[in-house]
Amino acid sequence: MPLLDSFTVDHTRMAAPAVRVAKTMKTPHGDTITVFDLRFCRPNLEVMPERGIHTLEHLFAGFMRDHLNGQGVEIIDISPMGCRTGFYMSLIGVPEEQRVADAWKAAMSDVLKVTDQRKIPELNEFQCGTYHMHSLEEAQEIAKHILDHDVVVNHNEELALPKEKLQELHI
């Protein structure tokens, strides 16, 4: 099995909250797709609660588009990481990390403005695969955590696992 890019960085050294360009690629038509690692929690030390991350998934996708789309950027998808420490965001374009961080903070402010769980988009059995597994309160606690901290930039070159370590790990 090929080694995925996300497993070549040292998770023990990742800061959070932080933005990291996880990958860039060109489409056959020459568009640049950028994948961002939006790290909400320090890996192996913190984790977002499942109901909160699920609710945040519903809210974050729309709010980030409100604040980041335009000026050569269009979000394709925002999805939670299975480890529940962050989200991956794929988009067309190459925005600066600070622009992404600013949009992230603005989106978290929007999450705090949601006043009722019934206002969560697509919160029904027809549009959500686990529509009972939500918590606006937990999503707002996650958002507040981001707003209470600086969003920094994680750089791949600073987090790269040495080849010797990858070999030691049998990768």
Swiss-Prot record:
Fe cation binds at H54, H58, C128. The keyword Acetylation does not apply. Its EC number is 4.4.1.21. Its cofactor is Fe cation. Pfam families: LuxS. It catalyses: S-(5-deoxy-D-ribos-5-yl)-L-homocysteine = (S)-4,5-dihydroxypentane-2,3-dione + L-homocysteine. GO terms for molecular function: iron ion binding; S-ribosylhomocysteine lyase activity. Binds 1 Fe cation per subunit. Keywords: Autoinducer synthesis, Iron, Lyase, Metal-binding, Quorum sensing. Disulfide bonds: none annotated. One of its GO terms (biological process) is quorum sensing. The keyword Iron applies. InterPro entries: LuxS_sf, Metalloenz_LuxS/M16, S-ribosylhomocysteinase. Belongs to the LuxS family. Involved in the synthesis of autoinducer 2 (AI-2) which is secreted by bacteria and is used to communicate both the cell density and the metabolic potential of the environment. The regulation of gene expression in response to changes in cell density is called quorum sensing. Catalyzes the transformation of S-ribosylhomocysteine (RHC) to homocysteine (HC) and 4,5-dihydroxy-2,3-pentadione (DPD). Homodimer. This is S-ribosylhomocysteine lyase. It comes from Serratia proteamaculans (strain 568).
